[in-house]
Amino acid sequence: MKTSRLPIAIQQAVMRRLREKLAQANLKLGRNYPEPKLSYTQRGTSAGTAWLESYKIRLNPVLLLENSEAFIEEVVPHELAHLLVWKHFGRVAPHGKEWKWMMENVLGVPARRTHQFELQSVRRNTFPYRCKCQEHQLTVRRHNRVVRGEAVYRCVHCGEQLVAK
């Protein structure tokens, strides 16, 4: 989905939230961190990604459309917090104590590592594999690696190699 297919009102709400939280952080931290670049090119089941070196936030337009209010309230500050932590502390654990502090004490948002959005519309096809204790669903990428002989996957519970059903 291209940015142009995302309603302008939603894009504006995202920018408002981003700017509001950035201003709040700059005030509390006594800094003047710049506004990050924003794109709507994230794909798959991730709601967003913070690209530290390029100081950019990628958001998933499908999940944003389907969960606008929660997405804007939670995901936008979540990704902004990653960039602010990187600027403020340098390279640290992605969801470590610095990120949690930035989320809760600076941005005033509950620090949750993962979203709870329905993923049916963005979930890719999977391929069934088995071990001796359960069935597993491998992504297209992992399935293709098995088919090409580039990878072998094992069950984390029983340790047995996964085989296609």
From Swiss-Prot:
Subcellular location: Cytoplasm
InterPro entries reported for this sequence: SprT-like_domain, SprT_Zn_ribbon, Uncharacterised_SprT
Free-text cofactor note: Binds 1 zinc ion.
GO molecular function, one term: zinc ion binding
Entry GO terms, CC: cytoplasm
Keyword Cytoplasm assigned: yes
Tagged with keyword Metal-binding: yes
The protein's required cofactors: Zn(2+)
SprT-like domain residues: 20-163
Keyword terms: Cytoplasm, Metal-binding, Zinc
GO terms (BP aspect): response to stress
Pfam families in alphabetical order: SprT-like, Zn_ribbon_SprT
Binding site for Zn(2+): H78, H82
Active site (record annotation): E79
Family: Belongs to the SprT family.
NCBIfam families recorded: PRK04860.1
Record protein name field: Protein SprT
Species whose genome carries this gene: Shigella boydii serotype 18 (strain CDC 3083-94 / BS512)
